[in-house]
Amino acid sequence: YHPHGDSSIYDTLVRLAQDFNVRYPLVDGQGNFGNIDGDSAAAYRYTEARMTHAAELLLDGLGENAVDFRANYAENDEEPVVLPAGFPNLLCNGATGIAVGMATSIPPHNAAEVIDAARFLIETPKATTADLMQFVKGPDFPTGGVIVESHESMLEAYETGRGGFRMRAKWEVEDTGRGTYQIIVTEIPYQVQKSRLLEKLGELLEQKKLPLLDDVRDESAEDVRLVLVPRAKTVEPDVLMESLFKSCDLETRFSMNMNVLHKGAPQVMGLKDVLLAYLEHRREVVVRRAEFRLDKIEKRLHLLDGYLIAYLNIDEVIRIIREEDEPKQVMIARFGITDIQAEAILNLRLRALRKLEEMEIRGEHTKLVEERDELVKLIGSTRRQWTTVSKQLKAARDQLTEDPALGDRRAAFEDAPDVDLAAALEASRPKEPLTVVLSAQGWIRGMKGHGLDPDSTKFKDGDELYLSEEVMSTDKIILMASDGRAFTLMADKLPGGRGHGEPIRLSIELEDSVDIVAMFKLEDERKRVMASTVGYGFIVTEKELESNRKAGKQAVNTGDGTLNVCMPVEGDMLAVVGSNRKMLIFPLDELPEMSRGKGNKLQAYRGKDTLAD
């Protein structure tokens, strides 16, 4: 690793101590280490830290030649290439990162489930991803919440290494008496800051974009407790929550891209491949630690053999030490021992040379020989190696699940309820009389009540009334532009009538050269005659004119002309009058009904003649 400043190192240490950020914290922090609201940790002179048991598991065996080491950035020290990893930290704690041309995003999982799947894979190497998902149900996020992704979608994600998981806040209904209730949010999605979530909800309430919600309060202490108050007791809790899930971070999506470094090269791996790579790594760690321990035992046995020779010839050893000028060489020649054994004998204290010491050394020798034999068998048997890996994983599982608060699954799984949100939102909107006013200069507003008096309506200097329409606040308004486009506005979303309103071009994308030629309340089954100045027209049902896009919908192809007729169908005959002062009358049923287009020729014109206004 290249050198980092103390600030980035401390920020990383803080994150590893936050149980709402890391599923299995690797740092045990003492002091203020931040919170889920996004508040910063205290400066490092005010905090203390130590490794957790999970971190110790990751490092277990590091000093026993379990992994390779390499020179560090400055080449003045060595660092491990990988850690021994007594538990599968990559899956349990997840990982996110970005590099040049690639990125990784791995969600955290429950250690007990992952370890159970790994041990099952040892016993059943041909197990499929579906088999492994009997143990690994899905991600397990530190902040809990509810995962509403289908099993099929998660299976595909774990097979390919790419996918995503929809996360929702966990909530419950609390009865407040007299038929009323409030919703309590107890868990929020992973990596969502509570303070920002509340800020967003407040903004949406102020902008009147949450018609089903009346108020939101934060009553959190150590645990999350957000109180959501419905606008009316008739609002169904499921409907209210579905509307909030679509509007803010009470629902988020965690994208999975299991792009990992395997044997030094990046590749996207599925769940089974990641587990197989981890298990092979653990088997290698077991073998290397066994070889390291075997080497230590051989060296110790070599010394013990020398000690035993000394005890069998204790009087001679003492004489040599007292009388000879070169006692080491004399002992080597006299007893046939090695230089190392002779040096060890010379380093013994004379007062330790007693019968009891001999018995202890013989006992130690016997135990080490037995351990050596077991290690030799382990190194020579793949089956024994896998058995050891499985036992070690079982021990790690027991250690990580000893505390239920850490070990138990936090994230739940549910199916998203089938809710007709559009109908519920429509039913919740208050129905009040409004008069929609459009001025000649293009300012629009919704004035309360019907029966508008044009003389009492105020406009900007030089402006005047152009179009008006009496509607209800739950209605939709259709605006027809001279270029043939149709726009839809919600009556209750229009600016109020106290001021002059706002320019219509803030609500719809209207070019400066284009004007509004008609404005009316949408009635789905009502029909209208549409005609352009070049003499073409057709009949359209108003429902076909509705559009949710700010750019509107191209309903009429006006050709070289403009739209100048948009009138409701009445009677059974149609009279067409041009600027040439000629009139043509024909049955209305001869005009085609279309959803969009140019229509039929209504009347032929020459030169500059057009359809009359």
In which residue ranges do the predicted regions lie?
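Catalytic phosphate-handling regions of large nucleic-acid enzymes and associated NTPases
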Residues: 1-164, 227-229
